[in-house]
C-alpha cells in the first residue's frame, strides 16, 4: 500500500512469504530469485488439488511455516539462521507426514521447494528448528476495537470523515453451485476445481468445487480459502481456510483477530454455530463474510464496499474473478430450462438439459418442489435453485443451502428491494467479461488516478 520503506534489504524475504501464501491469486510483483517461483506453483497446487478427504497434512506444514515467517515475527534480512530454522521445521513436518502423502503432487512440490530454498540460503540440514509461533490474544473483555485503534482501521469512520457513505455490494455462492455476483446476476455454474471468487488489493477468496458423487457433473464447494492482506497499522496478513467437515473458528495460525498491530481487532472471527456457521468481520475495509457448512458442503456470502471491489492494480487482469465477472459462458448451466423440461416428468431427466452424465438417486419432481416450498415459499431463483439441486444431487441438505443463502442476502444486501431475484442471467457472447458498472470504461482512468492519490479505501 505504501512506498518502499527502510527495510529494503528484507524485501525479497517478505515477498517470499506474501507470494507463498497467496501465489494462486497472482499477488506480488515477481521475484528476482528463481526459488520464488516455487511458491506460486505450490500455492496453486494446494488450491487446485482438493485435500478434503486426504490424510496428507501438507496444508498444516504450510500454515506453520507461513506463520513462522510472516508478520511482526518474520526473520529480518540478517536473520538467515532463523529462516533456516524455520525451513528445517518445515522439512521435519513434511517428513512426519510423508507416509500419508505418497503421490500427492502438492507434497512433492513442497519437498523440492524446501530443498531449493535451503540450498539458496546455505542452510544446513542439521541444526535447531524454530519454535511454534504463539499468538498474543487480546486482553480479557477486549471484544471491541481497541480504543487506540487508528481511525484508518474503521471503514465507516474514515468515510464519514470525508463526508461520504460507502456503497455496499454483495456476492454469494451456494449449492450446485449457484453464484450471485456483485451486480446481482444469478448464474448456475459447473466450475469444477479451483476458482477465484474475489481478487483485489485487500482481499482474495478462492473456492474449490468437487463432484457431489463420482461420475456426476453436479459439483459443490468443498474448500474455501480467504486471504486478508497485510494492511498498514491495522492487521497482519491472515489466511482462513475451511474444508468439508472442518469449519474452523480461527485463522490457520490459530488466531482469531488481525495480529499484533494496534488495529488488530478490526479483523475478527466469530463462531455463530459450532462447525456450521462462522462470520468474519473486517472493519478496516468495511467487509463482512459469512461461511457456512450445510451438510457436507460450504456456502459463502460477502458484503463489501464497491470501493474495495474496484481497488485493483490492473483491471485487465481480473479475468476469472467470479463475483465480479460471473462464470464463463462454457461453465454456465441453464437450470431454468432444466426446470421447465423436468416439470411434469417426475424423476425422468432429459439428457440434453441435465448437467450430469450419470445422476445419483434423486427426488421425484413433486417431492423436490414440496421440500423447497417448506423453506422457500417465494418462487424466486433461490427456490428454483433448490429444486434444481434436489433433482441433480438427491441431497436434501441443498434445501437448507438455498435457504441460508437467501437469509445471508437479507442480512448483507444493502438494497432490500433486490433480495429476491426472478430472472436468471445468462451472459450473451461479448458480455461475459463485463465487470461491475461501478467503474464505467470512460471513468476508469479517473478511478485509477483516485486509487493512486488515496491509497486507503474502505
UniProtKB/Swiss-Prot annotation:
Residues 121-149 are annotated as: Disordered. Keywords: Autocatalytic cleavage, Cell membrane, Disulfide bond, Glycoprotein, GPI-anchor, Lipoprotein, Membrane, Signal. The keyword DNA damage does not apply. It holds the Pfam family RGM_C. Residues 54-176, 434-458 form a propeptide. Residues 1-53 form the signal peptide. GO terms for cellular component: plasma membrane; side of membrane. Glycans are attached at residues 122, 167, 397. GO terms for molecular function: coreceptor activity. It is found in: Cell membrane. GO terms for biological process: BMP signaling pathway. Coiled coil: none annotated. The record marks 176-177 as: Cleavage. Disulfide bonds join 153-234, 171-323. Member of the repulsive guidance molecule (RGM) family that performs several functions in the developing and adult nervous system. Regulates cephalic neural tube closure, inhibits neurite outgrowth and cortical neuron branching, and the formation of mature synapses. Binding to its receptor NEO1/neogenin induces activation of RHOA-ROCK1/Rho-kinase signaling pathway through UNC5B-ARHGEF12/LARG-PTK2/FAK1 cascade, leading to collapse of the neuronal growth cone and neurite outgrowth inhibition. Interacts with NEO1, BMP2 and BMP4. PANTHER family: REPULSIVE GUIDANCE MOLECULE A, RGM DOMAIN FAMILY MEMBER DRAG-1. This is Repulsive guidance molecule A. It comes from Macaca fascicularis (Crab-eating macaque). The gene is RGMA.
Amino acid at each position: 500500500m505504501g512506498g518502499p520503506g527502510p527495510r529494503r534489504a528484507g524485501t525479497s524475504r517478505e515477498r517470499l512469504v506474501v507470494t507463498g501464501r497467496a501465489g494462486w491469486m497472482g499477488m506480488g510483483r515477481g521475484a528476482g530469485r528463481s526459488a520464488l517461483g516455487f511458491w506460486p506453483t505450490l500455492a496453486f497446487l494446494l488450491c487446485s488439488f482438493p485435500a478434503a478427504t486426504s490424510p496428507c497434512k501438507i496444508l498444516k506444514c504450510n500454515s506453520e511455516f507461513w506463520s513462522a515467517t510472516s508478520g511482526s515475527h518474520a526473520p529480518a534480512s540478517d536473520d538467515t539462521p532463523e529462516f533456516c530454522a524455520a525451513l528445517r521445521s518445515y522439512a521435519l513436518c513434511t517428513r512426519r507426514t510423508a507416509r500419508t502423502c505418497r503421490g500427492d503432487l502438492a507434497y512433492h512440490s513442497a519437498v523440492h521447494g524446501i530443498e531449493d530454498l535451503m540450498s539458496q540460503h546455505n542452510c544446513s540440514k542439521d541444526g535447531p528448528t524454530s519454535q511454534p509461533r504463539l499468538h498474543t490474544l487480546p486482553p480479557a473483555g477486549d471484544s471491541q476495537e481497541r480504543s487506540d485503534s487508528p481511525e484508518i482501521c474503521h471503514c465507516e469512520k474514515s468515510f464519514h470523515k470525508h463526508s461520504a457513505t460507502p456503497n455496499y455490494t454483495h456476492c454469494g455462492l451456494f449449492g450446485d453451485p449457484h453464484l450471485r455476483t456483485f451486480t446481482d446476476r444469478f448464474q448456475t455454474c459447473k466450475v469444477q476445481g479451483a476458482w477465484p471468487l474475489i481478487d483485489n488489493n485487500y482481499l482474495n477468496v478462492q473456492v474449490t468445487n468437487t463432484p457431489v458423487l463420482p461420475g456426476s457433473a453436479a459439483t459443490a464447494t468443498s474448500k474455501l480459502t480467504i486471504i486478508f492482506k497485510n494492511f498498514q497499522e491495522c492487521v497482519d496478513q491472515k489466511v482462513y481456510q475451511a474444508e468439508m467437515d472442518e469449519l474452523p473458528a480461527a485463522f490457520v495460525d490459530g488466531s482469531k483477530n488481525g495480529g499484533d498491530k494496534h488495529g488488530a481487532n478490526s479483523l475478527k472471527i466469530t463462531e455463530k454455530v459450532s462447525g456450521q456457521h462462522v462470520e468474519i468481520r473486517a472493519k478496516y475495509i468495511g467487509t463482512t463474510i459469512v461461511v457456512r457448512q450445510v451438510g457436507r458442503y460450504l456456502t459463502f456470502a460477502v458484503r463489501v464496499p464497491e470501493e474495495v471491489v474496484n481497488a485493483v492494480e490492473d483491471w485487465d487482469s481480473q479475468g476469472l474473478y467470479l463475483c465480479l465477472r460471473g462464470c464463463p459462458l462454457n461453465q454456465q448451466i441453464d437450470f431454468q430450462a432444466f426446470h421447465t423440461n423436468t416439470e411434469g416428468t417426475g424423476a425422468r431427466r432429459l439428457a440434453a438439459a441435465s448437467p450430469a452424465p450419470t445422476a445419483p438417486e434423486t427426488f421425484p419432481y413433486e417431492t423436490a418442489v414440496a421440500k423447497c416450498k417448506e423453506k422457500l415459499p417465494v418462487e424466486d431463483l433461490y427456490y428454483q435453485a433448490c429444486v434444481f439441486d434436489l433433482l441433480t444431487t438427491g441431497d436434501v441438505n441443498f434445501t437448507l443451502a438455498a435457504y441460508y443463502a437467501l437469509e445471508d442476502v437479507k442480512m448483507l444486501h444493502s438494497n432490500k428491494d433486490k433480495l429476491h431475484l426472478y430472472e436468471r442471467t445468462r451472459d450473451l457472447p461479448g458480455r461475459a467479461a463485463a465487470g461491475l458498472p461501478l467503474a464505467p470504461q470512460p471513468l476508469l482512468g479517473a478511478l485509477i488516478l483516485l486509487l493512486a492519490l488515496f491509497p486507503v479505501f474502505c
